[in-house]
Amino acid sequence: MKKPLGKIVASTALLISVAFSSSIASAAEEAKEKYLIGFNEQEAVSEFVEQVEANDEVAILSEEEEVEIELLHEFETIPVLSVELSPEDVDALELDPAISYIEEDAEVTTMAQSVPWGISRVQAPAAHNRGLTGSGVKVAVLDTGISTHPDLNIRGGASFVPGEPSTQDGNGHGTHVAGTIAALNNSIGVLGVAPSAELYAVKVLGASGSGSVSSIAQGLEWAGNNGMHVANLSLGSPSPSATLEQAVNSATSRGVLVVAASGNSGAGSISYPARYANAMAVGATDQNNNRASFSQYGAGLDIVAPGVNVQSTYPGSTYASLNGTSMATPHVAGAAALVKQKNPSWSNVQIRNHLKNTATSLGSTNLYGSGLVNAEAATR
C-alpha cells in the first residue's frame, strides 16, 4: 500500500460466539495497541482489506461482537498488516483461518551502550591502497537517521518513524554508525571502512533511540525496493518477530546483505534480528581482541569487529567515541561494501561467506563466530 490508511473497522467471515457487553461507543474508547497481523498469503491480505473497506466501519464477528481496527500499513512484499486494535479483540481475530499470527509491534532499541577505534584493526587501509573504497556500493543505514556532516556523503533515504519525517538524526546513534561505514577520506575527522560507499539514511528509530518492528520491516522493504547492496541494522530486541524475520528474508531474497548487531546484554544468546538465519550477526571485541564484556554471543554469531571506544561522526559536525555491538556492526557492513566493489557480480550470500572465510580466528566460534573481520584478506 503506497499511502497511509485511514481509520477503518475490520470484519471477518467467522461467526464467533463471544459474550460482548460493551456498547459500540465504549468499544471505540478502549485503549488500542499496535499489532502486526500475518496472513497465510498475500492475496488474503488484499481480501481482508477490501472486506474492511466495504464494511463501512462496522466489523461484525457475531451478533454480539464487533471489532474496530485502525490500519496503519500494508506491506508490499510480505503478507502483513500493521494495525491498531484493542488487546481484547486479538483472540477473536486469531480464529480467522486466513490469519497465521498476530503479534505485538514490539519496541526495538539501539545497541549502543555508553559514551566510547577499529579501522586499522580490520585492516581497511590496506584495501584502500588497492583502490577499493566501496565505490558504487549502496549501503542503507537503518537507524535513527543520519545528520548532515562534513565528513559524510549521504545520497538519500527515507523515514518510517511516525512524526519524524526528516531523515536527520535526533539521537546521534545513526550518524555514528554511518561514519564507521563511510566517513570520507578527506582532511578532517575520521576515516570509514568504505569511504566511497553510497550512504542512505533509512530512519526506523526515533530520537529516543527506539522504534517498532513495523518501522524496521518497512525500512528493509525500502532497502529491497531501492537496490541497496547492504543494510546495516545496529539495533535489536530480545523478542522474536515473525514479521521482522519475513522482512529480513524478503530483503535477502532481493540481494540485500543484512548485517545486524548481536546485542549488548552480555548474554550467551544473540538478539533479533541478528539471530535470524538470513541476517549476518556481529559481535564486539575490544582493543586486545577479546570479546567485549557486553557483547552477546552463542549459536548463530557470524563474525566480530571492534566495538569498544569507537570514534566516529556525530551530529553537529562533531565526533564521539561510543561502545556497543552497534559500533562493531558497521565495520562489517563497510567491509562488505569493499568486497562488493571488488566482486560486483557476487551475491549477498557469497559476500557473507567470503567475509567469514577470510576473518581472523580469535578462538571459540561460540564467542567470536568465524573471527575478526579482515578487510585486507577479504579484498586480496
From Swiss-Prot:
Cofactor binding note: Binds 2 calcium ions per subunit.
GO cellular component labels: extracellular region
Keywords: Calcium, Hydrolase, Metal-binding, Protease, Secreted, Serine protease, Signal, Zymogen
InterPro entries (UniProt xref): Peptidase_S8/S53_dom, Peptidase_S8/S53_dom_sf, Peptidase_S8_Asp-AS, Peptidase_S8_His-AS, Peptidase_S8_Ser-AS, Peptidase_S8_subtilisin-like, Peptidase_S8_subtilisin-rel, S8pro/Inhibitor_I9
Cofactor section: Ca(2+)
GO terms, biological process: proteolysis
Propeptide: 28-111
Compartments reported by the entry: Secreted
Record-annotated Peptidase S8 domain positions: 116-379
Signal sequence extent: 1-27
Binding positions for Ca(2+) 2 per the UniProt entry: 274, 276, 279
Superkingdom of source: Bacteria
Residue ranges annotated for the Inhibitor I9 domain, each copy included: 34-111
Active-site annotation: 143, 173, 326
One MF term in the entry's GO annotations: serine-type endopeptidase activity
Major place of residence: secreted
UniProt EC number: 3.4.21.-
Enzyme superclass (EC): hydrolase
Binding-site positions, Ca(2+) 1: 113, 151, 184, 186, 188, 190
Family statement drawn from the similarity comment of this UniProt entry: Belongs to the peptidase S8 family.
Protein name: Alkaline protease
Organism: Shouchella clausii
